[in-house]
C-alpha cells in the first residue's frame, strides 16, 4: 500500500484553491492514494491570528496533520515547500518522497526587499504604479484568507 500524500499550498492560497480546484487531489485519489490536505495558519480554513508570534512555527500545524502510522509522501508549493523542507529536516522519519516546487533561490537567499514590497501591497501601501505588489492583496483575498493575518 502506498503512503498517503500530504499536500501543502503556498502563501496566500489554501488546500482547496491549490490542490482541490485544480484537480490534483482528485488525480491522486483516482490513483489510489490517500490525500491529506492542510491549510497553513492564516490561510483557508485554518485559524487566522493577527499575532506574529503565532506564525513562528508553521511546521507544527503540518506535523499535527500527519498520521501516526508511518511516513507520508509530501508535495509543497512555495511557502508550503519551505515548510515541508523544514519538516523533512526536523523529522526525516515522517517523510518518504518529497516534491518541493516554487521556492527558487528563496530557500537559500531571502529577498528582504521583495518581501517588504509584498507586505506593502497586501496592506494597500504600495505605490499605485506597483501593480504586482497590489496583486498580492487580491491574490490573498481570493482564497478566503484574512490578508492582514498574512503579513
PLM segments and residue spans:
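Short beta-strand immediately N-terminal to the catalytic nucleophile in serine-hydrolase-like folds
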Residues: 74-76, 101
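Active-site loop/oxyanion-hole signature of alpha/beta-hydrolase fold enzymes
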Residues: 20, 30, 34-73
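Gly/Ala-rich beta-loop-alpha elbow adjacent to hydrolase catalytic centers
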Residues: 76-84
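Alpha/beta-hydrolase active-site loop signature
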Residues: 12, 40-44, 105
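Flexible "cap/lid" loop of the alpha/beta hydrolase fold
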Residues: 85-90, 95-126
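The serine-hydrolase catalytic nucleophile loop
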Residues: 12-25
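The conserved beta1-alpha1 loop
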Residues: 6-10
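Hydrophobic, aromatic-rich cap/lid helix
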Residues: 137-151
Amino acid at each position: 500500500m502506498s503512503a498517503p500524500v500530504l499536500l501543502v499550498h503556498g502563501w496566500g492560497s489554501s488546500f482547496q484553491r491549490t490542490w482541490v480546484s485544480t484537480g490534483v487531489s482528485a488525480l491522486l485519489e483516482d490513483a489510489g492514494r490517500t490525500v491529506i490536505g492542510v491549510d497553513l495558519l492564516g490561510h483557508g480554513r485554518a485559524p487566522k491570528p493577527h499575532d506574529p508570534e503565532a506564525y513562528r512555527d508553521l511546521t507544527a500545524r503540518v506535523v499535527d496533520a500527519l498520521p501516526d502510522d508511518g511516513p507520508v509522501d509530501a508535495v509543497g508549493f512555495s511557502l508550503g515547500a519551505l515548510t515541508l523542507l523544514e519538516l523533512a529536516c526536523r523529522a526525516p522519519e515522517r517523510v518518504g518522497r518529497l516534491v518541493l516546487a516554487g521556492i527558487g533561490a528563496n530557500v537559500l537567499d531571502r529577498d528582504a526587499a521583495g518581501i517588504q514590497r509584498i507586505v506593502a501591497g497586501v496592506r494597500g501601501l504600495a505605490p499605485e504604479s506597483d501593480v504586482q505588489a497590489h496583486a498580492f492583496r487580491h491574490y490573498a483575498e481570493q482564497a478566503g484568507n484574512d490578508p492582514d493575518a498574512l503579513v
